[in-house]
Amino acid sequence: MSMPTMTLVNQLLIALPSMPDPHFARGVALICQHDSNGSMGVVLNRPSEYTLGEVLFQMGIETASETLREQVVLAGGPVHPDRGFVIYDSEHVWGPSLLIGDGLYLTTSRDVLTAMAEGSGPSRALVALGCAGWAAGQLELELVENNWLMVPADASLLFDTALEQRWQRAAGRIGVDLFRLTDYTGHA
C-alpha cells in the first residue's frame, strides 16, 4: 500500500530566522506547483526595482491608471528573473492559468496584464519577476531542516497586507512571533 502524496500547493512558506539562503531570508513564498518533479513558488515580500508602469511600458501596454502604474513589481525569486508571473484572485480566468486554490491563479499570460491596463482585469493581482524553484525532494528536505514554517495561503495576506508586514503576519496566523525565535535549530 502506497502512502498518499502530500501537496504543498496553496501553502505559504515562511522563512525561519535560521534560513541560510539570502534569496529567502525573512521571505514568504506562495507554493504554486508541487509534485514528484519538484516545486515552484513566488516570493511575496521582496520588491523589485521596477514598477508595474515600467514593465507595462516595456511591453508596449498603455494604462491610464496611476495606481496600476505605481504598483510595485515583486522580485519573485532567483529563477527566470526576466519572466513575469501574475498571481490573481478572480472568478474569470485569463489566458492559460494554473489554479492554485480558492479562486487564486498563476499565469504568465500577457492577457491578464492587458486586461488590468484596460481596467477589465482582476481587481486583486500581484506581479512578480522571477520565481523560486526546488528540485524533487529539495523543498521537503528544507522543511525537515527547519528552514521554513508553513501555513495555508490567505488572499487577505497576499493582497491586503503591506510587503514589509507579510513575513510577521503570515507567521502570526499560527501564533508564531518570529522575533522571539533563535536562529539556531535542532532536533529532539
UniProtKB/Swiss-Prot annotation:
Gene3D superfamilies: VC0467-like. It comes from the Bacteria. InterPro entries: AlgH-like. Pfam families: DUF179. GO terms for cellular component: cytosol. Belongs to the UPF0301 (AlgH) family. This is UPF0301 protein XF_2228. It comes from Xylella fastidiosa (strain 9a5c).
